[in-house]
């Protein structure tokens, strides 16, 4: 009797496990992005192009903290004269979501600016405090 009971439990367990592991859904493709200039080059250029179709952006510096990134660089027209201004210093803020860098607007992530204490990190800021100055104050 005990052998029959153990065999029955084993068969039921195998059936349950087989049901859990078989699926017609494809497995999710995931991954985590890296915080490098190379990984942020395309998202930063896409942000520049969103501001103007002819814009180009070159990343000079990159700061990263807690799944967030701030790029600092020069934003300007692709046809800027070689002997003239190339563009303006510009920062872009990104948040990592899996394998992608998602652009974030300062008004959505920097919180409420305090003119009496301009360098204070706002309580309602979403961006990490380590990136607040470079992403929100410059």
For each feature predicted by the language model, list its residue ranges.
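Extracytosolic low-complexity repeat regions of secreted or lipid-anchored proteins
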Residues: 70-138
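N-terminal export and membrane-targeting signals
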Residues: 1-10
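Secreted/processed peptides and extracellular or luminal domains of membrane proteins
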Residues: 26, 40-42, 70, 116-117
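C-terminal motif of bacterial Sec signal peptides marking the signal peptidase cleavage site
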Residues: 16-19
